Amino acid sequence: ITYPPLDKEGIGVESPCNVHLVVCGMTDMGYAMALTAAHIAHYPNFLTAKKKSKITFVDADAHKKMAEFRSKYRALFDLSYVLYHEYTAGRETNRQEFLPSKDFLDIEWEFCQVPDFDDTYWEILAMEQEDNTNEYLTMAICYDSQKLCQNVAFYLPEIFYEKNIPIFYRNTILYAYEKELLTSDKFNNIYPFG
C-alpha cells in the first residue's frame, strides 16, 4: 500500500495551504502518529504566510488525556497554541484556549472531546471542508478497537469520500469484505495500517 503524504504534492514558500492531521483515538498509536507528524510537518510557507500545521485529537476522554499528554511534553506545549473543544448532545459545550509563552512554532494543537459514535464533530469538520481548498486534511483513526476504527473510517459524512480526503485506519486483520470495499471507487481514499 502506498500512503499519500500529508502535504499532497508539497507545500512551497508561496503556498496558501496548510496541513491538518486529525487523529481519532488518544491511544499509543494515536500519540505516535501525532508526534511523528509534529516532527515532520514543517513547511516553508510558515515564514511567509504564517501557515501552521494543525494536529487535532478526537477522543471521548480528551480532556483528561490532553492534560496527561501536555504534562508529558510540557516543553513542547509551553511553546504551542492549544485549543480544546467539548461536544455534547450535538453542540459545542466547552471551549478553552491555551496561548504559548512564545509564538514561534509552526505546529498548533487541538483536542476535541466527543462521545464515541456522536457525529457532531464529523459534521462540523465536513462543513469546514466543503469550500476549503487551502487545508490538506488527513485523518488517522487509531482507536484500540478495530471495530470502532472500521466504523469511523467507513461511515463518515460523504464529503470525506467525495473530496478524496486520505483516511488511515488502524487494522490488524483485513477481512474479505474490507478488501472489496477498499477497491471500490467510493472508498479508494481509505488506507488500512497496523
Task: Set out the residue ranges of the language-model regions.
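Cytosolic regulatory regions of ion transport systems
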Residues: I1-G194
